[in-house]
């Protein structure tokens, strides 16, 4: 990845609210299925905005820090997804998204961020990201002191 896109907590909350607005009315949904781990925080934000209490997870491992590797389903929510929102933080190459579509063909699959290769696999997203860009999510970062340039 040649570029980085840094996401702050504030940005994430703003984008999640935009996505939640598009998912109204809330009473059309039975619940939310979060794709672990990237979709966990966005699912909490959507659940709050939409007043949804039924939140489940599908646990798929497809990244090893910044490298994609073999995909493995560790846990899945029951059913075909009918009446459920499935959320992940982003759709990248589409590998995870294809697995989600196979598991939950009737779900409404959304992400906050979408890269060109994966975009056709989601029903909705908020932000376009170039394919060669790595997204730094706020839960992966910490605040660090940076000394002044003058050294004083």
Curated annotation (Swiss-Prot):
Residues that bind Mg(2+): 89
Catalytic reactions on record: GMP + diphosphate = guanine + 5-phospho-alpha-D-ribose 1-diphosphate; XMP + diphosphate = xanthine + 5-phospho-alpha-D-ribose 1-diphosphate; IMP + diphosphate = hypoxanthine + 5-phospho-alpha-D-ribose 1-diphosphate
InterPro entries documented for this protein: PRibTrfase_dom, PRTase-like, Xanthine_Guanine_PRibTrfase
Binding of GMP, residues: 69, 92-96, 134-135
Binding site for guanine: 92, 135
One GO CC term, this protein: cytosol
Signal peptide: none
BP-aspect Gene Ontology terms: GMP salvage; IMP salvage; purine ribonucleoside salvage; XMP salvage
Principal cellular location given in the protein's record: membrane
EC number(s) reported in the record: 2.4.2.-, 2.4.2.22
Topology within the bilayer: Peripheral membrane protein
Keywords: Cell inner membrane, Cell membrane, Glycosyltransferase, Magnesium, Membrane, Metal-binding, Purine salvage, Transferase
Sequence intervals crossing the membrane: none
Top-level taxonomic group: Bacteria
HAMAP family on file: XGPRT
Family: Belongs to the purine/pyrimidine phosphoribosyltransferase family. XGPT subfamily.
Identification of the protein by name: Xanthine-guanine phosphoribosyltransferase
Name of the encoding gene: gpt
């Amino acid at each position: 990845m040649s570029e980085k896109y840094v996401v702050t907590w504030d940005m994430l909350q703003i984008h999640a609210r935009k996505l939640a607005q598009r998912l109204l009315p809330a009473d059309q949904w039975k619940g939310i299925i979060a794709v672990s781990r990237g979709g966990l925080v966005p699912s909490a934000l959507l659940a709050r905005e939409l007043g949804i209490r039924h939140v489940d997870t599908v646990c798929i491992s497809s990244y090893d820090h910044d490298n994609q590797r073999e995909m493995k389903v560790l846990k899945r929510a029951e059913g075909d997804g009918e009446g459920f929102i499935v959320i992940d933080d982003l759709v990248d190459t589409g590998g995870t998204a294809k697995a989600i579509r196979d598991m939950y063909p009737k779900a409404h699959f959304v992400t906050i961020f979408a890269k060109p290769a994966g975009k056709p696999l989601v029903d909705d997203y908020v932000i376009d990201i170039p394919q060669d860009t790595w997204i730094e999510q706020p839960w992966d970062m910490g605040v660090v002191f940076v000394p002044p340039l003058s050294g004083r």
